[in-house]
A protein has these predicted regions:
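Hydrophobic helical membrane-anchoring modules
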Residues: 1, 177-315
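Structured catalytic core of nucleotide-sugar glycosyltransferases
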Residues: 1-128
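Residue-level signature of catalytic and energy-coupling elements of molecular machines
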Residues: 6, 24, 80, 95, ...
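Short conserved micro-motifs on helix faces and helix-strand junctions that flank
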Residues: 9, 67-69, 158, 231, ...
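Residues in soluble alpha-helical coiled-coils and helical-bundle/repeat scaffolds
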Residues: 12-15, 97, 101, 169, ...
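Conserved amphipathic alpha-helical interaction elements at protein-protein interfaces in regulatory
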Residues: 26, 30, 54, 58, ...
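Acceptor/aglycone-binding surface of glycosyltransferases and processive sugar-polymer synthases
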Residues: 63-83, 100-181, 197-216
Length: 315
């Protein structure tokens, strides 16, 4: 019997976990597969831990790993992928926005021979127009800058064959953007569209700061265009300076005095701001290089509650 691993990162989701686990159990009971439901607790501070332990004691399919600290959604997802042992691995969120009823369709596509089955969100129920527009234009900007095409409306709700999972595990960068990594790997893939539901309960734990950091990771991990933009802006600035110098020289040769204090102040402020912005772009890339060369572990496991887990992995 083939085995399906369902990897679910959670952070302070005590109101959603039990309902989500019941929904998965109902869907998988109708399918001819063994499965594991692997939760990765990303340092939750509510009652998520206790609920996961209770679910694991009552249902052999429910497994859980507890990270030593809040490492972020992408790292928690990576931990789950690293420890999933199924013939296929499905990654999804546990707030019911990724519909469990779509799992049979993903598995069907996998059985047809596709090694990556990527879902694409058509829309999200209850989401503001502003958030829809920012998401839409972010993906357009990302695709314009990046060498890897990221499907607009793409998410981390996907199925991967064991072969693709083993390939993904070889990517160990710290500033992780798994959508980009999966998009760059190749393999035979297909798309399944869906409408994302509203959250079953609670509020999104993805703050504005986390969303901005995630967006920057996506752009900087797969594009050098910001660095090239800095070069082009520098060239234009130099050209502007040469033209301004020629103008002043020409007027001086004509015996005219060029009034320029306000112009000088504006130019200094403008170019000073541009220089700081370009230094910031370079700094972002350098900071990521520093993060990689330290070669620190991506995550630390406080408790591995899977059946037969190697306890020496815990800290």
């Amino acid at each position: 019997v083939k085995r399906i691993s369902i990897v679910v990162p959670v952070y302070n989701e005590e109101d959603n976990i039990a309902h989500f686990a019941r929904s998965i159990a109902g869907v998988m009971a109708a399918l001819p597969y063994d499965y594991e439901l692997l939760f990765v607790d990303d340092g939750s501070r509510d009652g998520s831990r206790e609920i996961l332990l209770e679910l694991g004691a009552a249902d052999r399919h429910v497994q859980s790993i507890f990270l030593a600290r809040n490492a972020g959604h992408q790292i928690a997802l990576t931990c789950g992928i690293d420890h999933a042992d199924g013939d296929a691995v499905i990654t999804m969120d546990g707030d019911m926005q990724h519909p469990p009823e779509l799992l049979p369709e993903l598995i069907k596509k996998w059985e047809e021979g596709f090694e990556i089955v990527q879902t694409v969100r058509l829309t999200t129920e209850g989401v503001s127009l502003l958030k829809r527009l920012t998401s839409k234009y972010y993906y357009r900007l990302l695709n314009a800058l990046s060498d890897v095409e990221i499907q607009e409306g793409g998410s981390d709700f996907r199925l991967m064959d064991r072969k693709a999972v083993l390939a993904l595990r070889r990517y160990r960068e710290h500033a992780r953007f798994i959508r980009g990594i999966v998009g760059s790997m190749g393999f035979r893939k297909t798309i399944v569209e869906f409408v994302a539901h509203e959250r079953f309960a609670g509020q999104s734990k993805f703050s504005l700061h986390k969303m901005i950091s995630f967006a920057l990771d996506g752009i900087l991990a797969y594009s050098v265009q910001p660095l090239r933009a800095a070069f082009y802006v520098g060239m234009l600035s130099a050209l502007f300076s040469v033209l301004l110098f020629l103008h002043v020289l020409f007027e001086t040769m004509r015996g005219e005095t060029v009034p320029g204090w306000s112009t000088i102040v504006v130019c200094c402020a403008f170019f000073g701001g541009m220089q700081m912005m370009m230094l910031g772009i370079c700094g972002e890339y350098i900071a990521r290089i520093l993060q990689e060369v330290k070669n620190r572990p991506l995550y630390l496991i406080a408790q591995d509650n899977r059946q037969g887990a190697a306890k020496e992995e815990e800290v």
